[in-house]
Amino acid sequence: MSKELDTVEVSIRVPFGKSKRLSTTASRRARVQSIMYFLAFNAASKYYTNYELLHNGVEVDEQQLISELAGNEQTVHLQLRLKPYNTGEVIRHFVTFREYIGFVGDSDDDITSLALSNVAKFRELPLTDIAAASGKTEVADDRQKEEFQVSDAEKAVFTKELDSILELRPSAQDVLKGGSALSKPCLRSLIISGYNPVPAFFRTKGHLLYLQAVTLEGETLHITATVSGFYVNKSSAIKFDPTLKTDAAVCLTLYELLTKHSKKFASHLSQLEAALKAHESVNYVKPISVFLHKTWFPSSLPSNSIDFTEYQLEALNFQTERNFNDEFQAVKETSSEDIVARLEKEKLLNRVIHDFNVAASKGSMEIFYGNMVAMNPDAPRQEHIFLKNNIFYSFVSDLDGHYQDKGGDAAAHAASNQDLHIIKTLLQSNMRSVRHLLTAVVEFGGVRILAQSPVPGILDTAGMKFIKNEKGEEEAIQAKNDITVCYGFDEASNKVIADAEFGSSLDDFAKVFHLKKHEVDGVELKVASTSKGVVGFDKRNYILDLADNNPLDVGFALENFDAVTDEKARYPHRQTLLRRELVEKWWFSKVDGTGSEMEAAYEEGKFSYNPDAYKIEGIEDETVVELSDYLRKEVVPTLVKEVAEGSITAPFNGEHLVDIMHKNGINIRYLGRVIELAEQELEAQRALREAHLQQVEADNKEFTEWEANYLKHIESLIKERQVTIQKLLAEGKEVPAELKEELKLDDKEIRKPHEKEGVAVNNDQLSVLLTLAQIEIISRSIKHVFRKHCHELPAVIIPTFIAFALNLLFGYCYNKAPIAEFPTDGSDIDFAFTKLTREQLLSEISEQAVLRFRYTLPDGWESRYEHTPFALLRPICNKFGIQLLNKEYFFTREQYQNWRQAQDKKIRSKLVEPVSTFSINDLSVRPIIKVATLTTGVSDDCWAQGAYMINEEEKQATALALFSQSIAFREETSGYVHPTVAESYLALSTIHSKLEKKSEAVALCRKACAIYERVCGFDSFEMIRSLNNLAMLEMANDSPYNAALCLKTIMSILSVVIPVNHPATINSYSMLHSMCSSLQNSSAMIKVLNKLGDIIVEIDGHKSLPYAVNESRLANLYASVGEYKRSLACIESCYELFSKELGVNHKTTVECNSWITGVENLIESTSQSKALAASKAAAAAKQGEKKPAQKQQQSAELRDKSIDELMNFINGGSAPAKKSKKKKNAKK
């Protein structure tokens, strides 16, 4: 790799700037394009967009390798020569310039016109600068290691932040409010002028385009773009004169022109560049291969200024109609012999795939809004097909009856998702023998569209064919297309076909998906019979209809579809396939279980299955049954068990639960089963605890009896000794030494305290799992109900239905009889949904829960979310594509009145009481876009090499360099803002942390947080997970204030997304307690533990082992600050609980009992000391003497003690031990 990454110096002579020269370094194996990227981001050259690079006077191509220019030299000398503009270059310059001067905001991406994104706000978190590496050394004593090395100022701000956390009462509106935009335009507007197109007369004078700018001073500039540059012309709003304005000059760039005509432009641009420079670029750069997260709770409506640039640019688009399939397949065929070639290939693939996804999304929305003409306009709407920009669109439904016996449209819906999942796998496989189509699934208002790049030639007509009919007359008919099915099921002939030549191209496909050869209708196949193999006009082999290459979940299908005769109770479809992750998990387990070699098992096709088994009558395969049983009997129960035990982190929200299930290969239809198993686990744990408590009670009773008998036994021994001694004395004999010594007891008879573990119920883990699984079931059931009612509605009426339905669900306590609110233009159509009642809606939701998840919702389930409506609103909005405006919503009249009274009197008189909780003006509907994306193999390989080396100390530096290079590769191919980039930063931060590189770990984790917020959302589980990591890293890096800020954010988000206490909240308070301890702030520790105790009570109740443990920690703290009575109350509470939970003869209980005696003695001693001190003070006052107060000194010493020292002191130890003695005692 080192040879490939050798660098050279690049010196570029430019016609601008003071030095007239720019320098950079570049890899020899990079292309000239990388130098052009440098020029595009360099401050001195970025405003020049139209140039060519010369080497030795000859123009170089951007795809040329730098090594070809450098030869054996270490420096490459290039010249930048400006070119005359043409219209296309002027438009490119105009678009690029708009981006540079703030017209493209932080929340803008390629589909901003379809949905809103919030401005990210993680960068606004008032985190202090990353602390430098700590100066702690290994020889520091234990206490120094535990203490933070922070200033008094940071201690103060931490304490203040802690107090705000303890009083935290966040609202969804505050938590999810977006940030402030970093990028703000430096002009009021910059648009293409209405005087375009350029008249023919002026076109011959070199005019290319007319622009119009309004400066911040309010001056309107009409600009002419010519082949030589830009100048301000004489036009006005009412007069067209594109000639050069008096005293104006031609400028090479718009930047140069506007700087001359607007002082505020220059100053605001400097401020913008300074603001951007102050932040990592991931906070504001536009993503190039993914979409930004489209929030369910946008902070504001889009602030549209007069700017119709997007429409104008589409009209002025000089590109020919793109053929995405040709581009995609051509790039896949390019060589990838070295790293540079592979990177270039992956970069181009990412760009083509993303451009297709953007075009497919926008095209689908044109269809939903009725702006695209169908190819078959006379057919019913569901049968309409569309073709635009070489993308084929069709509504997802069972048009040809293929799924008639499997559930019809419901099965077709499921198959479209399954098809996309197969394509995701194919994208990663880099398979070239057989091709797939670019695919996107776009859903809007419950209607789903499948967008695909068509097989070349499949939509072309073969012209007309003339034949003679029965009467002998010539008749024209459509000639058959040459593109026909040559492998798989051919609907035209109703036969299964297997062309041998095409079949040979499917070997790699069969290996990737672990498919075995099988026969269907006497024809041997390598893939599912429903898949279709065709050869396009481009002579490439294509495989279509991929879904059925995943095996059937036969156990589920037999039980919930085949065996159910009542269609209303039957699962909606039989397209219940197993996920790819499950198949891979099973396959790896089989390879490991049999001791097979991984590569050999793959190449030989071991552990493969028949994809047609149980889908076609008479075709069976035990492997498919094994796969289904593996999911149902092993994977699902194991997952529930692991969550219950805490070996898997409790999911942060519904999306996290779904992600955990999917990564384990579990389909969402098993949510009901997850709840069933979790409830069983909870009952089992409760039963185990109850049995344990009964056993402890019996043991306590038995021990008490033994103790009483043993005491009697000792008393009898003492009496016997006394009788013997008296007898000896009476006889005048000497008493033997053994009778003078302490009574010797038989150790075998003494019952020493035991240390058996108590039994606690994992309520925190299981309650979260149960709650989130139920929320997912409810929200998904609501999605299906909404989909049913919206299916035939016009797009503009969908918000009316949504507002009405949400009022029925959530606004019932505010308005029990909401009325559907239509747009201002009104509607003469009587829509059926307007007659829907709350009872009917709740009934439909419950029916869907039973139908799709085999789960019966508990009676009154809706009332559970009356106090936490946003916990359910959020997943509903995310799943159906609803965007609710971030504002105050009133779910009861009382809420509204309280809010109204809190407003200023002047405002209060103008307020209009809302008719219902939700209005159509509060929401919009966005498309749900499902796409397949590519991950970079070059980056993965580089990371794998680093992972192989990282555990070898002498290779750690190389490993870290490889990790960084991997991220750089990923950024180059996917862009700086991408989920996989964030994942890499998060993983690398963990690695740095383990290597004690704490500052670097914090920086990397902050970067991950910034990216995750933009692509996944502020309330996403990825963001919460990253913040949790960041909190731990900041804490380890001696930055308690920063850690507290992160924990506060986590708790705020969790309060919105989940209606029960999450283990992460408990963990957050535990971390705060630990930080307070390191800061030696006992009073703060007490506050945190009291808060933690309240949470434990909510989860486990007062009579629980966790509560007892927390109380014991409080007792220690109260004792350390001299509040002995409070300490005693806590200890007595602990003793009672430990006695019941652990037993009276448990070591902890015994220590607790002795502790009670010690504290009681301490209280009595303190009381006596006070009385003695008071009498001495009175006597001293008479004599005019003053002596230091012994108690104050003792209390101060006690406060400085550790918990172990306190225990020793309370249990009978003398004066406070010195630090040197602490270690000695600890060793004992």
Swiss-Prot record:
Asked if the keyword Zinc belongs to this entry, the reply reads no
Positions of the Clu domain: 298-557
A cellular-component GO term for this protein: cytoplasm
Provide the alphabetized UniProt keywords: Coiled coil, Cytoplasm, Repeat, TPR repeat
PROSITE patterns, A to Z: CLU
Q: How does it assemble?
A: May associate with the eukaryotic translation initiation factor 3 (eIF-3) complex.
Q: Which family does it belong to?
A: Belongs to the CLU family.
Record protein name field: Clustered mitochondria protein homolog
Q: Which organism is it from?
A: Eremothecium gossypii (strain ATCC 10895 / CBS 109.51 / FGSC 9923 / NRRL Y-1056) (Yeast)
